[in-house]
């Protein structure tokens, strides 16, 4: 169980916390991840979440670029300027901060979406629309969606 798979919707509690699904917490535990790196996704209205290796991957891409290039500067603005570290509380919950809410439109519920080596936080309706659009896009290109 070393991949983030499926999707789960959980309600935000009165204190602004949401429980990370147990299957996702198990992947984090297996990987020894204690601190989560979160950033505003480059394409979708979602927050991408993973361990330190997620940030490392982007920093390796930036290191391969000329540090003064537009590509490196744009990546840094997105990865560093659009990123934060968060920790889960002892019960496996995370705070749904303004950083998360403002970018995603999340209000009462969070859909956790597995993306293989990381997961994302979505507004449930936005995720349903994006998934439907992805299926339709694959259909239009003659690709199977299932």
Swiss-Prot record:
GO terms for cellular component: cytoplasm; nucleoid. SUPFAM superfamilies: AbrB/MazE/MraZ-like (SSF89447). Residues 7-54, 83-126 form the SpoVT-AbrB domain. GO terms for biological process: negative regulation of DNA-templated transcription initiation. GO terms for molecular function: DNA-binding transcription factor activity; transcription cis-regulatory region binding. Coiled coil: none annotated. Transmembrane segments: none annotated. It is found in: Cytoplasm, Nucleoid. Keywords: Cytoplasm, DNA-binding, Repeat, Transcription, Transcription regulation. The keyword Transmembrane does not apply. Forms oligomers. Belongs to the MraZ family. PANTHER family: TRANSCRIPTIONAL REGULATOR MRAZ. This is Transcriptional regulator MraZ. It comes from Rhizobium meliloti (strain 1021).
């Amino acid at each position: 169980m070393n991949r983030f798979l499926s999707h789960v919707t959980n309600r935000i509690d009165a204190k602004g916390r949401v429980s990370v699904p147990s299957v996702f917490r198990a992947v984090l535990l297996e990987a020894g991840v204690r601190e989560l790196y979160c950033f505003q996704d480059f394409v979708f209205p979602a927050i991408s979440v993973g361990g330190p290796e997620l940030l490392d991957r982007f920093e390796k891409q930036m290191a391969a670029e000329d540090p003064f290039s537009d590509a490196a500067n744009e990546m840094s603005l997105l990865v560093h300027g659009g990123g934060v570290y968060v920790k889960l509380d002892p019960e496996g919950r995370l705070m749904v901060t303004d950083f998360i809410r403002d970018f995603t439109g999340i209000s009462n519920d969070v859909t956790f979406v597995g993306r293989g080596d990381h997961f994302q936080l979505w507004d449930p309706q936005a995720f349903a629309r994006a998934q439907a659009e992805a299926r339709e896009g694959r259909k239009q290109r003659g690709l199977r969606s299932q």
